[in-house]
């Protein structure tokens, strides 16, 4: 597999900020294909709760890394990295532009940077990096990294127990070696971080999205997954699913929906914190201007970037 300096566009941001629509519009105008950078959308049958793009929303644009595995088949960062890089090569071989769109920052960094994986469950270099990260950013930030990898394990370990959190990350990453943020990307990548300065505006959009999920049949989707035997899988610990399971067991729906909204808002806040620390990109404020105006900014910067890459 080639890791030459292939141009890649990356669109990240918190949930409900407009990544999907932005990516599709960009792909339509620039002959691109989408690679999903989401750790839940890789699972089959988990559509509504993961806000997976629908066939209608795709508008004919090919999407990669959706519906890859069943909910009882765990997706590791290493496996995702391999699949995503293969997709980039395949898209580029067709003369098209790879566009990565998603909110799982760790997965996206693993695609772009020289993360190495070994079969070891313990890795001294990784452990030292994680301990330094905890000292610099705090125990909560470290715990958030574990949550991105293994939400269930994160629930079992107190954030202040740094040693256990570090060890859990080591195990979850199967010896992944971290790189510093100053390392160059393996690709000629242009990265956009979509966000909203007005948190209440973003939170309102999140609440509306959750209400729409309920209308679209989220409870029935979770019911089907539980009936299929997936109740206790790691995938079902994802936000959007774990909150609904108690409803199937007799708990009232309204408090569960409110809990889902709260959890999603907290997750969006953690995503933004992570992006600030881990990504040096173009931050696009999506709340003040119209979508069309914001898209023009993104499109113009992308065209300029591609021209510059071509002239090198």
Curated annotation (Swiss-Prot):
The keyword Nucleotide-binding applies. NCBIfam families: miaA (TIGR00174). Residues 38-41, 163-167 are annotated as: Interaction with substrate tRNA. HAMAP family: IPP_trans. ATP binds at residues 13-20. One of its GO terms (molecular function) is tRNA dimethylallyltransferase activity. Its cofactor is Mg(2+). Belongs to the IPP transferase family. This is tRNA dimethylallyltransferase. Monomer. The keyword ATP-binding applies. Substrate binds at residues 15-20. It comes from Exiguobacterium sibiricum (strain DSM 17290 / CCUG 55495 / CIP 109462 / JCM 13490 / 255-15). One of its GO terms (biological process) is tRNA modification. SUPFAM superfamilies: P-loop containing nucleoside triphosphate hydrolases. The record marks 104, 127 as: Interaction with substrate tRNA. Pfam families: IPPT (PF01715). It catalyses: adenosine(37) in tRNA + dimethylallyl diphosphate = N(6)-dimethylallyladenosine(37) in tRNA + diphosphate. Catalyzes the transfer of a dimethylallyl group onto the adenine at position 37 in tRNAs that read codons beginning with uridine, leading to the formation of N6-(dimethylallyl)adenosine (i(6)A). Keywords: ATP-binding, Magnesium, Nucleotide-binding, Transferase, tRNA processing. InterPro entries: Dimethylallyltransferase, IPT, P-loop_NTPase. Its EC number is 2.5.1.75.
């Amino acid at each position: 597999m080639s890791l030459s300096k292939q141009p890649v566009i990356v669109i990240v941001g918190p949930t409900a900020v407009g990544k999907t629509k932005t990516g599709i519009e960009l792909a339509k105008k620039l002959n691109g294909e989408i690679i999903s950078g989401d750790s839940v959308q890789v699972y089959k049958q988990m559509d509504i709760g993961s806000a997976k793009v629908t066939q209608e929303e795709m508008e004919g644009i090919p999407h990669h890394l959706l519906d890859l595995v069943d909910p009882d088949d765990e997706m590791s960062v290493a496996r995702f990295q391999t699949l995503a890089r293969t997709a980039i090569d395949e898209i580029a071989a067709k003369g098209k532009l790879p566009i990565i769109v998603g909110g799982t920052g760790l997965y996206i960094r693993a695609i772009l940077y020289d993360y190495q994986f070994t079969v070891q469950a313990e890795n001294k270099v990784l452990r030292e990096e994680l301990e330094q990260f905890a000292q610099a950013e705090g125990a909560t930030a470290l715990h958030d990294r574990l949550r991105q990898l293994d939400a269930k394990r994160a629930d079992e370990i107190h954030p202040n127990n740094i040693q256990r959190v570090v060890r859990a990350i080591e195990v979850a990453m199967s010896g992944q070696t971290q790189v510093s943020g100053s390392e160059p990307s393996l690709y000629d990548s242009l990265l956009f971080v979509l966000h909203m300065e007005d948190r209440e505006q973003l939170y309102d959009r999140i609440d509306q999205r959750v209400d729409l999920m309920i209308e679209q049949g989220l409870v029935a989707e979770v019911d089907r997954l539980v009936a299929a035997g997936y109740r206790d899988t790691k995938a079902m610990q994802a936000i959007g699913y774990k909150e609904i399971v108690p409803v199937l067991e007799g708990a009232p729906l309204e408090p569960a929906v409110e809990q889902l909204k709260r959890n999603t808002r907290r997750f969006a806040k953690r995503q933004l914190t992570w992006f600030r620390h881990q990504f040096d990109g173009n931050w696009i404020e999506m709340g003040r201007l119209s979508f069309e105006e914001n898209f023009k900014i993104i499109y113009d910067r992308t065209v300029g970037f591609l021209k510059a890459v071509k002239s090198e």
